[in-house]
Amino acid sequence: MAQTPEFEEEIYCSFCGKSSNEVKKIVAGPNDVFICNECVALAQNIINEELTVDQAAQVLSLPTPHQIVAELNDYVIGQEDAKKTLAVAVYNHYKRINENVSPTTDVELQKSNIALIGPTGSGKTYLAQSLARILNVPFAIADATTLTEAGYVGEDVENIILKLLQSANFDIEAAQHGIIYIDEIDKIAKKSENVSITRDVSGEGVQQALLKLLEGTNASVPPQGGRKHPQQELIQVDTTNILFIVGGAFAGIDTIIKERLGERVIGFGSDANDNAVALDSENILEHVQPEDMTKFGLIPEFIGRLPIVTVLDELKVDDLTKILTEPKNALIKQYTALLGLDDVELVFQPEALEAMAELAIKRHTGARGLRSIIESVMKDIMFDIPSRDDVEKVIITKASVQNGIAPELHLKKVG
């Protein structure tokens, strides 16, 4: 018969020091370590608090649409309607993500990707880039013309996600909240509305390949890119919360819009009424509808993934002049600062600025063409000034821009 001990050795919690008589339960661990139920509960509370903090950290600090536009105004000139539309769309997108992290409603909030329509150099890429900078999220740019559907020579659509991963330093969680801008999206339009028997590898096929990414899927991304490393382990990226912004000039869609509205020919000798004149104005693209984009060559399913469409205006001379001088990172400010490092004052005459703007319009390059123009004007000055210590001021004139005449140099006074 087993002998019952007269007393059991008292056990103490290794963490709080309480005895087994003071708590409900003490659990034994290896190496004579014990923990009581109270310390277990306390540890669980600490863990829960840390998880709550980690979850809160995933909630993006989100500026209001007014704040977003105010910050965009520091860098982007004009395009007021587009800025407002983008600010609201981006705010709602990230508000939706924050809601998914800490749900307060059982309503399913769906993603709204964005399409930007506007001429070359109107600021489509720069707007998307500026939004990502304001929100401090990873950003990547892709060129739709380089994409092909799987099985053909070219770039797989998954490589777009790879660029975003690279921008996020392969932080998958950060990348999954990033922004991707796909440029030249109009170049992957179908060649005709009728489905061709032959494969359109750079048109409808690419649109089909992009569909899943835009709506949200677990994309298998090759970390080394391309198809050169078939054995590489793939990275899984959920695109559900990635905001896709696509942009294109959509040259010729204005004609499609006019035809839909019954204004086939507006010009000399036409009986156009006041409404027709309005439709022929520069704001014709503001009347764009999904059916126009379908007729242009985008498939309905693809358009359906882009519920927000905004139009950018063609930039005028006044806009381009302001772009040269007003933003925080304006080109004129940059070159003035560069010459200032050599103790030389740089001045652009107003007529010179206007001439550069007119040249950009003449070349149909818009804002993106301004840098090459100013680089050409400044090349010799930037080459010579570091070797001279007698120049006090450089003045860029209209003739410097239009005719390549050397800028005016003001020399330092001797003695």
Curated annotation (Swiss-Prot):
The keyword Transport does not apply. Zn(2+) binds at C13, C16, C36, C39. Pfam families: AAA_2, ClpB_D2-small, zf-C4_ClpX. It comes from the Bacteria. Keywords: ATP-binding, Chaperone, Metal-binding, Nucleotide-binding, Zinc. Residues 1-55 form the ClpX-type ZB domain. Belongs to the ClpX chaperone family. This is ATP-dependent Clp protease ATP-binding subunit ClpX. Component of the ClpX-ClpP complex. Forms a hexameric ring that, in the presence of ATP, binds to fourteen ClpP subunits assembled into a disk-like structure with a central cavity, resembling the structure of eukaryotic proteasomes. ATP binds at P119, T120, G121, S122, G123, K124, T125, Y126. The keyword Chaperone applies. GO terms for molecular function: ATP binding; ATP hydrolysis activity; ATP-dependent protein folding chaperone; protein dimerization activity; unfolded protein binding; zinc ion binding. One of its GO terms (biological process) is proteolysis involved in protein catabolic process. The lineage of its organism: Bacteria, Bacillati, Bacillota, Bacilli, Lactobacillales. It comes from Leuconostoc citreum (strain KM20). ATP-dependent specificity component of the Clp protease. It directs the protease to specific substrates. Can perform chaperone functions in the absence of ClpP. SMART domains: AAA, ClpB_D2-small, zf-C4_ClpX. Gene3D superfamilies: 1.10.8.60, ClpX chaperone, C4-type zinc finger domain, P-loop containing nucleotide triphosphate hydrolases. InterPro entries: AAA+_ATPase, ATP-dep_Clp_protease_ClpX, ATPase_AAA_core, Clp_ATPase_C, Clp_protease_ATP-bd_su_ClpX, ClpX_bact, P-loop_NTPase, Znf_CppX_C4. Disulfide bonds: none annotated. PANTHER family: ATP-DEPENDENT CLP PROTEASE ATP-BINDING SUBUNIT CLPX-LIKE, MITOCHONDRIAL, ATP-DEPENDENT CLP PROTEASE ATP-BINDING SUBUNIT CLPX-LIKE, MITOCHONDRIAL-RELATED. One of its GO terms (cellular component) is HslUV protease complex.
